[in-house]
Amino acid sequence: MHIHILGICGTFMGGLAVLAKEAGHKVTGCDANVYPPMSTQLESQGIELIQGFDPEQTKLNPDLYVIGNLVSRCNPLVEEILNRSLPYVSGPQWIGEHILRNKWVLAVAGTHGKTTTTAMLAWILEDAGYAPGFLI
């Protein structure tokens, strides 16, 4: 499946792109600003990056668009996707349906300490003999 990710250079969407690539999908993506370190990491995975949100990107003809939370409704590429009724999902929806399906999920939320708490939780689970995955 070819997935085109809007907002690919954000931490969450970049992580999603790598997970999708590792799962065997063809991944391309775009963002308003494409620069290191995220651009370097994604390009090293063989993920094509496009600067900007030109509606012409629909000519890539992906099977699915994954739209990041920071990409607004007035975005020209989003409007083209909606006007043409092209298939799209949010990043969290794609992760839930394709990566986290049939897995136990522990989520850490809050204003401060999420990364530290997640790291401690992953370490505790690993030390207890589990093989946790994690996404920060």
Regions found by a protein language model. Name each.
Residues 53-62:
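Short amphipathic alpha-helix with an adjacent loop that forms part of the alpha/beta core around
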